[in-house]
């Protein structure tokens, strides 16, 4: 072998893997003998199983073999498979059938059972034939055995396979076997190599020149493929194409490919003759699979080749339960929706079972991959590479030790240990042993220590880390700044060659200041240890490391180095200059005893991956893995997942125009007062973001020598800008995009202020570029009036404008006007994207008009001009140019437009009402409120009295009235019930329910005397009847205090039953009922219930099931407490003395206990005065929180609140907020009204409502007509009135709602809609009113 040949094979062997022999299919005896000869030198032979011999001795032999080669047989499955392969054909069939019936059989039991059945069978058996050898040891196991031997070098094994096998086979008589059977070696020698290599190694070609037609076809095809490659265009070859792949045995089958990320499955052709994965455009569109452009043109097809210029991102795919991640080229047409190539199966160790039509995945072979070598030019620095250095305790560098400053010394951290499973114990022990061995940790006696936790590595193993969160609370912050990414990238401008260095275990290269080690102690089941080097997880570590590396690099970081933490990028403008720069940096690292991770370093590259970006001479783009992370994101299920998604998007925001606008619907879900509800709006927002990342722009490096252009614009909720620079081709290329959401205060700015805000924010964002420019840069805006405001030297209008003008003095710029139609990019940054339609493919940068609700058609213009003739002032402006110039009004296409780009319209016309209706009811904003609707319309139109007309329209909108809640104070002042003249004349009653069961009771009957405030508490059950309640009231109240005159209670079925009515009639008292859901009516009982519940909690909170035992104590405690309303105790008012409450006091008796005595009368009078005073005070306090009552008159239409009253209330959260409207019949009290409820619900609800539960229904037939959705009209009850509007008859109908069948509604609808709902009633109305239809 020549030296040149050896070097080429050496380079090839570095990239080759043993799995590449998976494609071998052979039946040649010579080849098998060759394999057997090679194998015999490395792996001992294990003969076939003979059931006629001792089974146990063969089991022992196999067991010893498994023990000797553990890497080949890691589990029971591999041992069982090896055992099956060593059975003869008959025994193998029997064993497979036995294993399918009992999958838990071990390989030992498999042999014993087989020996029992087959041991008596006589006859000739197969010996070591070719098929026997293949069953004994397949090609993959052959390679694994070679690789498993310690004395076989990884590299030389690959070299042996690639070189010796073809070379030996060449000597065989059978010349074509190695070409047709060993496909991977053939591909390497014939198809993969360069043309120059083919000329040099002619001895690898078959010696017989008289090949058959088939061989000649193969040779020609290979040549065609090689010639095609010279044109830099790849070719995908399929069986239906002109160019076929004859180098391997081809097999096809169709499987369902599951795409879990997109919740779909597609039929997929598994084709071993294909060299690339493909998918059709139709499939991509149907399942909305994300794609991206592909710069490498690919030809596929036969006689008429086609080009491919797009491919999908890497997709997660499941085939027969095997998960793989791969990408597809997108083609226009193919025989199947998608196809998986042999290469993909190959790379994922997937084999095809042609008999079972299934796929199976083999275990991957672990290979030792050598780290990239240090270039020869830097060999002098080999001693600072990780290859020559093991981790050890670094020497301290004076002034750069890691200091742990604490806010307080006397602190205690929580101590809690967690049991660890065996897997984590092993990972912990490995980390501890390694740390102790290298000296970076030591045992500690610290009294405070943080716990450890485990995080998964990329390869699936666990890494032990210390959770320093408890300690970080006491650590003083380090204010040393981390570099801004944008400023780092700006320093790279002009560089053409790059080298990236990565420090090995970067944090562990810094020593901890002596005396601070105990502060970094950590605890684990093995004990307490402390770090001698800077650990990960401490809050001040990132800032200190940045200070450390900046100090080490010194002045170099100002000229040819940028570094972010342990990532160091060296950049230069020429090759010779770059060598000096790299040596300078390596020397500085060497002087500081720092070690580089050679495997992650890249030397002398034209483009590199650095801090998440691909950086080159032209500019920088985001890394594909960061883009794929966003593209593959599923729909967030909660706020946490949404924040994670927005975090990934925010990292890429400089590449996404209109970021703030695109994320606006998503950010709204993160507000505290917004309930989580995912809608199609949010889904479309995510899709729009993903579309922007399918083909992200290349941002150029900022160059201070080039001309600068800043384009700005503002929309309703955000500002946007794009910074560009002019290059040698006289074109402007973007340096960066910027967008920002406005604050609540900024949303109220005028249009001019918002446009100026866009300029101010953009200048602040790019201040490091724009503040120090020598030549003035250009600012382009689409707001003409803004130029005058900035260049005007007159006194500013307000303090905000004065601050802005002062800020602008720091910049050297000139501002120019460009119409919005030409300001595509900046306008798009700030405008609202239509969230109901996908973004057109060819309009990524087109501006989107945010007030596109009304098209300015010729018909609209003609209608406006016609309206002008009816308005004297506008007609004067239309005909007088001087007047227009004086008032700064322009005439465009016959329309009058003011300085704010608003179209002037006559006031209060049919045209203005149409505009209001379109924006309010037909626009993309759902029934906006008065302020929002006004702001939207004012963007494009204006007329005199516009605000008043919009207010009147919105207030009379039927949909808004019944669905939107009111935020005003409640109606109606408090109307206290006057006190009675004496105790136990006026009572109130209620039940306390939901109590735990105690002695068979689970409720409490509460009776309160409204005069003395005395309470009677009687345990009962929730299921108590009216008869039982009456008996209880008779025995516990009337028997002691006599008959009351009146009782106030709620509308409980007990008190409204006939039994209770008879009971009231018997004892001659009147029942008064509080209003439903109006607790203020019977506030006394509500307050008493709260007090009783508090007392019960105090005495039995620890044993709640004993509350019945404490009722007498609670009642005594309540009745002997001084009441705030009477200034006396209830007991004293009723009984005229105070009982002894403890053994240390005596009861106090009055001299006169007669009820009619003068003293008693005086006490009652005092109590009554106190009650009246309390009522006045209570009314004053309550009335401070209400607004003036709105008086309703009989015949007025009102709506009833659903949510608070329970009236017609359903659990459906999308039900209207109000029911109605209903007619007012009469006023039934100071604040109560009786309504005309439909007969269908009168029996269900009280027809009397407090004014606080009512809202006036505003109805203006001039404004609102056809207010009903025709699908909501069920049965029409009757027709109230009619109107003719624009030659259309509208009917005001009262009807039963289809959406809420228990609701009676009314509203305007067209005659046609009414006829569809109920033809008979409509015809009767037309006939009775003599309407001419």
Curated annotation (Swiss-Prot):
Q: For the Integrase catalytic domain, which residue ranges apply?
A: 979-1138
Record: active site: 271
Q: TM spans, by residue?
A: none
**Which controlled-vocabulary keywords does the entry list?**
Aspartyl protease, DNA integration, DNA recombination, DNA-binding, DNA-directed DNA polymerase, Endonuclease, Hydrolase, Magnesium, Metal-binding, Multifunctional enzyme, Nuclease, Nucleotidyltransferase, Protease, RNA-binding, RNA-directed DNA polymerase, Transferase, Transposable element
Domain called Peptidase A2: residue spans: 266-342
Which Gene Ontology biological process is one annotated for this entry?
DNA integration
Ligase keyword on record = no
InterPro entries the UniProt entry points to: Aspartic_peptidase_AS (IPR001969), DNA/RNA_pol_sf (IPR043502), Integrase_cat-core (IPR001584), Integrase_H2C2 (IPR041588), Peptidase_aspartic_dom_sf (IPR021109), Retrovirus_Pol_polyprotein (IPR050951), Rev_trsase/Diguanyl_cyclase (IPR043128), RNaseH-like_sf (IPR012337)
Q: How is it modified after translation?
A: Processing of the polyproteins proceeds by an ordered pathway, called maturation. It involves the initial cleavage of a 27 kDa capsid protein (CA) from the N-terminus of the polyprotein, followed by the cleavage of a 56 kDa integrase (IN) from the C-terminus. This leaves a 72 kDa protease-reverse transcriptase fusion protein (PR-RT), which does not seem to be processed further.
Q: What are the Polar residues biased-composition ranges?
A: 218-231
Question: Per the record, which residues fall in region Disordered?
Answer: 199-231
GO terms (molecular function) for this protein are: aspartic-type endopeptidase activity; DNA binding; DNA-directed DNA polymerase activity; endonuclease activity; metal ion binding; RNA binding; RNA-directed DNA polymerase activity
GO CC entries: nucleus
Superkingdom is Eukaryota
Binding residues for Mg(2+) 2: 990, 1050
UniProt domain Reverse transcriptase: residue ranges: 436-615
Q: Which Pfam families does this UniProt record tie to the protein?
A: Integrase_H2C2 (PF17921), Peptidase_A2_2 (PF12382), RT_RNaseH_2 (PF17919), rve (PF00665), RVT_1 (PF00078), SH3_Tf2-1 (PF24626), Tf2-1_C (PF24614)
Keyword Nuclease listed? The answer is yes
Residue sites binding Mg(2+) 1 per the record: 502, 566-567
Disulfide bridge positions per record? none
Q: Which PANTHER family match?
A: PROTEIN CBG26694, PROTEIN NYNRIN-LIKE
- Additional detail: Retrotransposons are mobile genetic entities that are able to replicate via an RNA intermediate and a reverse transcription step. In contrast to retroviruses, retrotransposons are non-infectious, lack an envelope and remain intracellular. Tf2 retrotransposons belong to the gypsy-like elements (metaviridae).
Name the chain's protein: Transposon Tf2-3 polyprotein
Write down the species. Answer: Schizosaccharomyces pombe (strain 972 / ATCC 24843)
């Amino acid at each position: 072998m020549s030296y040149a040949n050896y070097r080429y094979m050496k380079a090839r062997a570095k990239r080759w893997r043993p799995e590449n022999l998976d494609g071998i299919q052979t039946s040649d005896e010579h080849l098998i003998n060759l394999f057997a000869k090679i194998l015999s030198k490395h792996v001992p032979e294990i003969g076939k199983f003979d059931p006629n011999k001792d089974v146990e001795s063969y089991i022992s032999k196999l067991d010893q073999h498994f023990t000797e080669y553990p890497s080949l047989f890691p589990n029971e499955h591999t041992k069982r498979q090896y055992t099956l392969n060593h059975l003869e054909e008959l025994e193998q069939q029997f064993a497979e059938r036995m294993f399918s019936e009992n999958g838990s059989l071990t390989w030992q039991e498999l042999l014993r059972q087989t020996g029992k059945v087959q041991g008596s069978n006589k006859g000739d058996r197969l010996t070591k034939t070719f098929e026997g050898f293949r069953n004994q040891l397949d090609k993959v196991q052959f390679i694994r055995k070679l690789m498993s031997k310690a004395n076989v070098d990884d590299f030389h094994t690959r070299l042996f396979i690639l070189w010796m096998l073809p070379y030996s086979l060449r000597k065989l008589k059978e010349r074509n076997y190695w070409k047709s059977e060993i496909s991977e070696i053939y591909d390497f020698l014939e198809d993969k190599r360069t043309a120059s290599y083919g000329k040099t190694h002619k001895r690898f070609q078959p010696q017989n020149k008289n090949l058959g037609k088939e061989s000649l076809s193969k040779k020609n095809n290979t040549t065609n493929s090689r010639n095609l490659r010279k044109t830099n265009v790849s070719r995908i070859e399929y069986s239906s194409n002109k160019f076929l792949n004859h180098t391997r045995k081809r097999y096809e089958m169709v499987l369902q490919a599951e795409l879990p990320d997109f919740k779909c499955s597609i039929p997929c052709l598994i084709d071993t003759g294909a060299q690339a994965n493909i998918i059709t455009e139709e499939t991509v569109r149907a399942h909305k699979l994300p794609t991206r452009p592909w710069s490498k043109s690919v030809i596929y097809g036969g006689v008429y080749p086609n080009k491919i210029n797009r491919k999908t991102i890497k997709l997660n795919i499941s085939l027969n339960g095997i998960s793989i991640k791969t990408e597809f080229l997108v083609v226009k047409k193919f025989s199947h929706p998608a196809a998986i190539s042999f290469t993909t199966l190959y790379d994922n160790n997937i084999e095809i079972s042609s008999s079972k039509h299934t796929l199976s995945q083999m275990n991957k072979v672990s290979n030792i991959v050598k780290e990239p070598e240090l270039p020869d030019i830097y060999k002098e620095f080999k001693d600072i590479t990780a290859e020559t250095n093991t981790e050890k305790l670094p020497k301290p560098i004076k002034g750069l030790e890691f200091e742990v400053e604490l806010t307080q010394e006397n602190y205690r951290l929580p101590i809690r240990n967690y049991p660890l499973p065996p897997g984590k114990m092993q990972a912990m022990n490995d980390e501890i042993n390694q740390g102790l061995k290298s000296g970076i940790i030591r045992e500690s006696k610290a009294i405070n220590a943080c716990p450890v936790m485990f995080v998964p590595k990329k390869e699936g193993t666990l890494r032990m880390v210390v959770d320093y969160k408890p300690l970080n609370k006491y650590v003083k912050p380090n204010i040393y700044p981390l570099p801004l990414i944008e400023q780092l990238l700006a320093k790279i401008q002009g560089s053409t060659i790059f080298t990236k260095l990565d420090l090995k275990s970067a944090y562990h290269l810094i020593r901890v200041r002596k005396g601070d080690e105990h502060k970094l102690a950590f605890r684990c089941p093995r004990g307490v240890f402390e770090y001698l080097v800077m650990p990960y997880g401490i809050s001040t570590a990132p800032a200190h490391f940045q200070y450390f590396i900046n100090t080490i690099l010194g002045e170099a970081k100002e000229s040819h180095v940028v570094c972010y933490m342990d990532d160091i990028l060296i950049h230069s403008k020429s090759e010779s200059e770059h060598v000096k720069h790299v040596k300078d940096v390596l020397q500085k690292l060497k002087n500081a005893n720092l070690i580089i991770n050679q495997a992650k370093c890249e030397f002398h590259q034209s483009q590199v991956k650095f801090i998440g970006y691909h950086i080159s001479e032209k500019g920088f783009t985001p890394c594909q893995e960061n883009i794929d992370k966003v593209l593959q994101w599923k729909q967030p299920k909660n706020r946490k997942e949404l924040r994670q998604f927005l975090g990934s998007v925010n990292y890429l925001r400089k590449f996404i125009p209109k970021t703030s606008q695109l994320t606006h619907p998503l950010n709204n879900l993160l507000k505290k007062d917004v309930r989580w509800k995912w809608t199609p709006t949010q889904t479309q927002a995510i899709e729009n973001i993903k579309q922007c990342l399918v083909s992200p722009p290349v941002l150029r490096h900022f160059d201070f020598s080039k001309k600068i252009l800043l384009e700005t614009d503002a929309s309703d909720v955000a500002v946007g800008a794009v910074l560009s620079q002019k290059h040698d081709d006289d074109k402007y290329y973007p340096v960066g995009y910027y967008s920002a959401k406005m604050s609540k205060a900024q949303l109220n700015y005028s249009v001019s202020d918002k446009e100026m805000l866009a300029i101010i924010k953009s200048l602040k964002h790019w201040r490091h570029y724009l503040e120090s420019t020598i030549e003035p840069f250009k600012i382009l805006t689409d707001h003409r009036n803004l130029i005058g405001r900035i260049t005007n030297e007159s006194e500013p209008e307000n303090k905000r404008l004065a601050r802005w003008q002062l800020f602008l003095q720091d910049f050297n710029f000139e501002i120019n006007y460009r119409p919005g139609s030409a300001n595509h990019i900046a306008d798009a940054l700030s405008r609202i994207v239509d969230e109901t339609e996908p973004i057109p493919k060819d309009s990524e940068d087109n501006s989107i008009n945010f007030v596109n609700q009304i098209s300015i058609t010729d018909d609209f213009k003609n209608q406006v001009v016609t309206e002008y003739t009816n308005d004297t002032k506008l007609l004067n402006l239309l005909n007088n140019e001087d007047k227009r110039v004086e008032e700064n009004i322009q005439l465009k296409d016959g329309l009058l437009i003011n300085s704010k780009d608003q179209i002037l319209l006559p006031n209060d016309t049919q045209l203005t009402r149409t505009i209001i209706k379109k924006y309010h009811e037909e626009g993309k904003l759902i029934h906006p409120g008065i302020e929002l609707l006004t702001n939207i319309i004012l963007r494009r139109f204006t007329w005199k009295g516009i605000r008043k007309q919009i207010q009147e329209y919105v207030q009379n909108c039927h949909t808004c009235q019944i669905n939107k809640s009111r935020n005003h104070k409640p109606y109606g002042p408090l109307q206290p019930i006057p006190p009675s003249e004496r105790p136990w004349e006026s009572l109130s009653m209620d039940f306390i329910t939901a109590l735990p069961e105690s002695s068979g009771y689970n409720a409490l009957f509460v009776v309160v005397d409204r005069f003395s405030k005395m309470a009677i508490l009687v345990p009962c059950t929730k299921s108590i009847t009216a008869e039982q309640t009456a008996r209880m009231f008779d025995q516990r109240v009337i028997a002691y205090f006599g008959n009351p005159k009146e009782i106030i209670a709620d509308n409980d079925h007990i008190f409204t039953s006939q039994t209770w009515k008879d009971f009231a009639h018997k004892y001659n008292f009147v029942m008064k009922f509080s209003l439903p859901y109006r607790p203020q009516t019977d506030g006394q009982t509500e307050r008493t219930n709260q007090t009783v519940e508090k007392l019960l909690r105090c005495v039995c909170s620890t044993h709640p099931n004993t509350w019945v035992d404490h009722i007498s104590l609670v009642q005594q405690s309540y009745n002997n407490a001084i009441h705030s309303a009477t200034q006396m105790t209830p007991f004293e008012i009723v009984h005229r003395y105070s009982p002894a409450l403890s053994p240390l006091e005596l009861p106090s008796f009055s001299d006169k206990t007669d009820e009619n005595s003068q003293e008693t009368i005086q006490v009652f009078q005092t109590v009554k005065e106190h009650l009246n005073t309390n009522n006045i005070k209570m009314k004053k306090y309550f009335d401070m929180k209400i607004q003036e009552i709105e008086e309703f008159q009989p015949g007025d239409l009102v709506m009833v609140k659903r949510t608070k009253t329970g009236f017609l209330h359903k659990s459906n959260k999308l039900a209207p907020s109000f029911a109605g409207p209903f007619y007012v019949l009469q006023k039934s009290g100071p604040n109560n009204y009786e309504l005309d409820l439909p007969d269908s619900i009168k029996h269900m609800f009280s027809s009397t409502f407090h004014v606080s539960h009512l809202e006036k229904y505003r109805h203006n037939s001039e404004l609102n007509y056809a207010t009903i959705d025709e699908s909501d009209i069920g049965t029409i009850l009757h027709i109230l009135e009619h109107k003719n509007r624009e030659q259309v008859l509208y009917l005001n109908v009262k009807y039963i709602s289809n959406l809420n069948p228990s609701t009676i509604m009314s509203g305007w609808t067209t005659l046609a809609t009414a006829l569809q709902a109920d033809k008979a009633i409509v015809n009767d109305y037309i006939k009775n009113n003599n309407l001419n239809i």
